[in-house]
Each structure stands twice: as C-alpha cells, then as structure tokens.
Amino acid sequence: RNIGGVDPRVLVSKRVKVGYDVPVRDGKPAQEALNGVIGAMAIHLQSAADRKNVLPIENLYVDIGAKDKDEALAKAPEGTPITFATPSTPIGDGCLLCKAGDDRVGCYNLLRLLHADVTCDTWFAFTCQEEVGSRGAYGAAFRIQPDVALILEGTTANDAGEQDETRKVCRLGKGVAVSFMDKASIAQPELFAELLRLAEGSGIAHQVKMAVAGGNDSGPIQRTGCGAKVCVLSVPCRYIHSPSTVLCLEDVEAQYLLAKAYLTR
C-alpha cells in the first residue's frame, strides 16, 4: 500500500530499502535493511493498451531477490516498511538532488534552530505522518498548546519547463516561500506581515507562495485547543512526492534565517 501521495508514474524500476537498519541492541545482532527494486510486468509482455496506462500500485511488487513467496515473507513480513534508496547528490550551481525534500528540509533547519538564542519559550516538534493526515501535528499541538506556530516544510515549485506563469507556485533560487493561505489554514495576517517585514529588513531572500493549494501541519495546529497563530515557511522543491526532489541550498538557508530572525527578534 502507498503511505502518502507518492506519484505512481515514477515507481517502476526504482531502488528501495525494505525494513530498517537496526544497530546492536540488548545483545541482539545488528540488522540491515534489505535492498530491493520495484518491479512490474516487462513492457514487451504488456498489451498495447496497457503500455498507454500508468500501472496502479496494486500491480507492482518489490523484488528482494527471494526465490519464492515463502522466502520473501520470511525476510519481509507483511507490514514491513519500504523506502526509496535515493542518495543525496549536489547538482547544478548550488542545488541538491535528494529524496523527501518535502518535508525533511524543515527538520534540517529545526535542528539548526535548536542552537539559536531564542527570546521566547520555544518548542521544536519533529512531526510524523504529515502526508497521511498530519497525525503527528495533532498530538504535538494538543500537548504544547502553542500561541504561535511556524511550520517549516518543503513545497512544490513547479517552475521547470514550459509552465503557464499562473501555475508556478514558487521558484527555486528566489528564497523562502511564505504562505498567506492554503487548503489547510489561513495565515494570521499580522504574523504573515511581520515575517515579510523581517525578511525585507534583514535582506533575506523571500517570495510569497502564489497558489492556494495543498495542505500541511498548519491546519491541525491552528485548530487544536484554543487555536494558534500560524504561518508556513517553505523551501521550494521540484518533483515532490517522488523518489527525487530538487531544491536550492540558498532557499534552505533563507528558510533558516527567517525563522531565526523571528525567534530572536
């Protein structure tokens, strides 16, 4: 089954890891994740009609080199998690090709912000399962009951190729994208304006996200308990929901600098 919004068009022949790397623990030996590849019926065996259609996930399988079904289930029982095995690679001039830029880039900058000299009581929540209903955000917001929440994430750039200008949500290399609204939340107007003022006054590259689409952890956080002022700071990412995302390192730095400027103001 698909956990999240992975694009089924890009799955066939992708290398994956099955299970987790587990270190030595309580006297038990270390365990390494299995290598695998996503397979499907060979194209020369498909009908002409089938070749024109995207194969549904139900028609795909993961090949771990097992000789039969029993061996496969012994090594990877039903429910074993599968992740893409995409290495992080610098490309172009200051860009990075990696998996899960949306939203691990936000986790990276949260780790950096842990060292900032913040001027207010600050909690750092590394939430899980955003792609399947922001489940981690609900628990974190219920526990913390924040007054203000900045959501650090990655978002679709859609700026490559011959796209209509109205469909270019944000652009790589133009700075952190600040959202005024999406399908999950509406940014608190004063907070949105303050972040833009901080960015302009500090010379931090920034842009306003130009599409009211998608959703993220801002929705549950804004509506949990007594509610919170929220605003989303996003790093533009190309090809989200795929094994390979592309982001600009200058945009990553801009997200960090703007969040830091707000927390240390």
What are these language model-derived features?
Residues 1-265:
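N-terminal hydrophobic/helix-forming segments and targeting peptides
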